[in-house]
């Protein structure tokens, strides 16, 4: 049987706890029923839950629902009573309360205003970064305008410096790209010269294979040597001419 209590909150908590325990028993019974080898046979715990705990679970659920409804109604009554209490004020007693408070604390409003003004001044000093300047009125406004102008000037200087830095970086990137292009041209010319020299060497080696070693004379070796030197000189001249172009 579900436990009853005059306190709806206590009934709600107890019913929730009992429902949690019954839910654990239900899961345990279902797990054993599913894990049993004989599917046609119903386990003892499952039967016990169906005959005993199922009715108790329904009673606890009903008790929990009733307690929740009671708490909702109590909360709505509290809200409505607080609203009516807020607006049900005796207008005749307002003047008396105000006059009494004014007579008892005549300097309270003045002290509050002084505290507010001091707090505002302290906050202004912190924001403006002032030292011990306590001037008010025109001097304070003038100093604030001067600081704003200084900040604007500083921002303009920073913008100009950043623009100059970006321009110099752009010029450096363009110069670096042009240098890379020149190096690419030089490497291309050197590659052409090397290909020409290698082609000449391949031609010479092919011709050498056609002749017999006995037919080669000193004049042929000298001619081959001169041809190799001329090929290297031609490659060097090509490398020197392309950067100038």
Swiss-Prot record:
GO terms for cellular component: cytoplasmic side of endoplasmic reticulum membrane; endoplasmic reticulum; Golgi to ER transport vesicle membrane; SNARE complex. InterPro entries: Vesicle_transport_protein_Use1. Changing residue 183 to G: In USE1-0; slows down protein transport from the endoplasmic reticulum to the Golgi at 37 degrees Celsius. Keywords: Endoplasmic reticulum, ER-Golgi transport, Membrane, Protein transport, Transmembrane, Transmembrane helix, Transport. It is a single-pass type IV membrane protein. The chain crosses the membrane at residues 219-239. CDD domains: SNARE_USE1. The keyword Iron does not apply. Residues 1-218 are cytoplasmic. It comes from the Eukaryota. The keyword Protein transport applies. One of its GO terms (biological process) is retrograde vesicle-mediated transport, Golgi to endoplasmic reticulum. Residues 240-245 are lumenal. One of its GO terms (molecular function) is SNAP receptor activity. It is found in: Endoplasmic reticulum membrane. Present with 937 molecules/cell in log phase SD medium. SNARE required for targeting and fusion of Golgi-derived retrograde transport vesicles with the ER. Component of a SNARE complex consisting of UFE1, USE1, SEC20 and SEC22 or YKT6. Belongs to the USE1 family. This is Protein transport protein USE1. It comes from Saccharomyces cerevisiae (strain ATCC 204508 / S288c). The gene is USE1.
